[in-house]
Amino acid sequence: MAGIPGLLILLLVLLCVFMQVSPYNVPWKPTWPAYRLPIVLPQSTLKLAKPDFDAKAKLEVSSSCGPQCHKGTPLPTYEEAKQYLSYETLYANGSRTETQVGIYILSNGEGRARSRDSEAAGKSRRKRQIYGYDGRFSIFGKDFLLNYPFSTSVKLSTGCTGTLVAEKHVLTAAHCIHDGKTYVKGTQKLRVGFLKPKYKDGAGGDNSSSSALVEKMKFQWIRVKRTHVPKGWIKGNANDIGMDYDYALLELKKPHKRKFMKIGVSPPAKQLPGGRIHFSGYDNDRPGNLVYRFCDVKDETYDLLYQQCDAQPGASGSGVYVRMWKRPQQKWERKIIGIFSGHQWVDMNGSPQDFNVAVRITPLKYAQICYWIKGNYLDCREG
């Protein structure tokens, strides 16, 4: 899109995203559903040997198992779910631990938890991640970049994207820091980059007189204190189970002091506003630019969303979000419902079809990630 028509479309998109204005006069409000959430709690922790940090960073993940393949796979048993949701923690000094978890449901009317007896918990080719016309929008200007929701997107020193989900926490894709066997080179000194204005000499601050002297944006980096990666990714990376658990949480050494976006349980695709998802990331083909896009969900499984949002390596780890009505508070709210993972070529009725894939935040994954953030399951009762 170029020229005046393209500019007008871009301005309309930014108005809808930034000002929370809907381009459609819908007579109903898509509402965040209420879920009865499980509880994922640590049971035992084991110290592990220090890992090698020699894996090459992969900025995308590919799989030949598409929607029909995944739909034909049975949901994990209770014991399998516990194995997949157990997790590895890496600390800044290079030490690591493995934590086994239990899965519970909260007894009605009680503040205690009880054990849950059961839980339903291609072919090589050039990867095409741009579909038809490139529908991505580079976001320029500090008035947009430094304000919500775009300000929640951050860059990882390994080359991926992450999203601020709490005062000190960043959600990203597991493959950005771990290849399924060991940690990516540079993970021990992992940093998270925040866009901020770069001023010419003698300028500074956010007042109007100095804002005219803004030269460009730059990254300010904060070190990561520890990371959590589910064992479903580590155990399952050799097969298509791993794709379902391609997410990780990073804890920063200090608060970032920005507005963040909460996580939420992913509703069924038919309940999403317009059937669409949104995400912003640092695609490698537009270095230094934050790139926003939105598109329709084409298909879904219990753990994955299949879509054809235009994306390039570097966007992996972006938080996939939607904006829906929160009935108790009587307000609109955006929530992260998934993590952009990568690209798939799949066989659809004998014809090759490619998708970009996002990992859905299911009730179990929500309980796990929320506990990583809060450290108290009682604070994780609302998805």
From Swiss-Prot:
Its EC number is 3.4.21.-. It comes from the Eukaryota. One of its GO terms (cellular component) is extracellular region. It is found in: Secreted. One of its GO terms (molecular function) is serine-type endopeptidase activity. Residues 1-23 form the signal peptide. Disulfide bonds join C160-C176. It is an enzyme of class 3 (hydrolase). Belongs to the peptidase S1 family. This is Serine protease 23. It comes from Rattus norvegicus. The lineage of its organism: Eukaryota, Metazoa, Chordata, Craniata, Vertebrata.
